[in-house]
Amino acid sequence: MASVVCNSSSSTTTTTLKTPFTSLGSTPKPSQLFLHGKRNKTFKVSCKVINNNGNQDETNSVDRRNVLLGLGGLYGVANAIPLAASATPIPSPDLKTCGRATISDGPLVPYSCCPPPMPTNFDTIPYYKFPSMTKLRIRTPAHAVDEEYIAKYNLAISRMRDLDKTEPLNPLGFKQQANIHCAYCNGAYIIGGKELQVHNSWLFFPFHRWYLYFYERILGKLIDDPTFALPYWNWDHPKGMRLPPMFDREGSSLYDERRNQQVRNGTVLDLGSFGDKVETTQLQLMSNNLTLMYRQMVTNAPCPLLFFGAPYVLGNNVEAPGTIETIPHIPVHIWAGTVRGSKFPNGDVSYGEDMGNFYSAGLDPVFYCHHGNVDRMWNEWKAIGGKRRDISEKDWLNSEFFFYDEHKNPYRVKVRDCLDTKKMGYDYAPMPTPWRNFKPKSKASVGKVNTSTLPPANEVFPLAKMDKTISFAINRPASSRTQQEKNEQEEMLTFNNIRYDNRGYIRFDVFLNVDNNVNANELDKAEFAGSYTSLPHVHRAGENDHIAKVNFQLAITELLEDIGLEDEDTIAVTLVPKKGGEGISIENVEIKLVDC
């Protein structure tokens, strides 16, 4: 089983595409999805000019030779999107064209997230070259560090915060570093008439890897320790499924007042959190977490684009994140941030700050610890084997970002240079990964659900709102397929034209071979197929409403094997709304066989 989230337009066409990957030895597996496309064209970029004190100048049009926006999308998206131009690799944005960022589901950010004034002509900024090293920096799990390390980490963050007071425009300062995420993620840069966004696509992993790389080196510079390494929040292991204690010490430089106070003091983390507390035991919650990790790292991500996310497409707002970005990356942000709609002591309304909103996430030191483990998952995923390897598509490899190094020198960086952490000078201290062997085996049901008692899909859809659990029967295009047929084609459970207001949290879970009596708080069951999730979005330039229109696909070949439904012509599907279901509509659902 593998999941794909895709944008749709008024008409959708399903297409088989191919993607080249870097050459690593592997054994083919049944669930493999490939994408490919050719593009090479220049186009104009319309950018807002704003200086660092927030004063906006007139709009400029900048000729960009390398502006991405990747190739087609996942399956139907490739042909459904009206392309404004052929896509080319995304360049590092011209920081002189930075505009005001917007709070997701809120007003403009009340300050400028743009970087300090450029010391030189942007076109002359060099590409970064790794400095020589004699020893790898080793990132360790945050729950296992000693007091000596905590003191050193506190000192580094404290000195970074001090720069905010003494040199507010110093790019090494704490707020300036946090603003990097705000600018790249909340609409400060306009490319091709659309906000540049490093989430929801294949840019997610490489952007954050480079971001942490320079952040880590800056911390080391501030305490004169070139071997200093960030910790990682080991939330994929039961021992790390809590807020790391060093971040929960009031008065320390690692503490953030704008966190959800309910997650303190050893509260078990919910890797599927979408704002509501799950009424279950700590043991069940940890079991759910390990199940989610297995689904997102193994079952749902047998091939690169499912893990990394879709290519970024020119002229279209890509909303096709990879598995780990959706869960657990997003839920950890939500879990740690303040509750949206609650009030701060000064009377301001929360938009999820700090961790729960991209513009402010970098203001919480735990953000970098969280993304340390997200980055570690990239390494762990490739280590599983099979088709799990880095993308070799040039539009990905040649995409660029911009950062200041620890000496305040500006550099451009490419995705192709961040594929090997050891070449970058760091590695991760090994920890057991119990989720790798946590494939759900117990079943929520005994035998096959009687599908004759369920309404057929064509009587349930179109669905106006998902305000309750919904079960239906759906026909398969073929049954009793041979192994060769499974290798050649993936069986895809496809939800066409899902619509919802993108200003709120959205999540619904999908189960096979259960009815509406399923206990949806127990995810460690073989019938759990996956989840559709969405965070509140920034209202993008050119949008006339807040309605998201997406397709959602789950590859179910492996799942049908696990629950013994390979020979059935009709199967039962159950949808369980977890967040925002009353605002979700779905046009239709079908099962397709798609070439791999």
UniProtKB/Swiss-Prot annotation:
Residues of the transit peptide: 1-87
Region (Disordered): 1-23
Disulfide bridge positions per record: 98-114, 113-182
Cofactor, free-text remark: Binds 2 copper ions per subunit.
Residue ranges with Low complexity bias: 8-23
Binding site for Cu cation A: 181, 199, 208
Reactions that this protein is recorded to catalyse: 2 catechol + O2 = 2 1,2-benzoquinone + 2 H2O
Catalytic activity, EC: 1.10.3.1
Keyword list, A-Z: Chloroplast, Copper, Disulfide bond, Metal-binding, Oxidoreductase, Plastid, Thioether bond, Thylakoid, Transit peptide
GO molecular function: catechol oxidase activity; metal ion binding
Subcellular location: Plastid, Chloroplast thylakoid lumen
Enzymatic class: oxidoreductase
Cellular-component GO terms for this entry: chloroplast thylakoid lumen
Pfam families: PPO1_DWL (PF12142), PPO1_KFDV (PF12143), Tyrosinase (PF00264)
Protein name as annotated: Polyphenol oxidase B, chloroplastic
Species of the source: Solanum lycopersicum (Tomato)
Taxonomic classification: Eukaryota, Viridiplantae, Streptophyta, Embryophyta, Tracheophyta
